[in-house]
UniProtKB/Swiss-Prot annotation:
Belongs to the glucagon family. One of its GO terms (biological process) is negative regulation of apoptotic process. The lineage of its organism: Eukaryota, Metazoa, Chordata, Craniata, Vertebrata. It holds the Pfam family Hormone_2. This is Glucagon. InterPro entries: Glucagon, Glucagon_GIP_secretin_VIP. It comes from Oryctolagus cuniculus (Rabbit). It is found in: Secreted.
């Protein structure tokens, strides 16, 4: 179960990183 929790938390982390990168890309365009 801890593995599944880690995976979901990690995917949330990646989503937040992707969102930040997207915002940076928009501001730089």
């Amino acid at each position: 179960h801890s593995q599944g929790t880690f995976t979901s938390d990690y995917s949330k982390y990646l989503d937040s990183r992707r969102a930040q990168d997207f915002v940076q890309w928009l501001m730089n365009t």
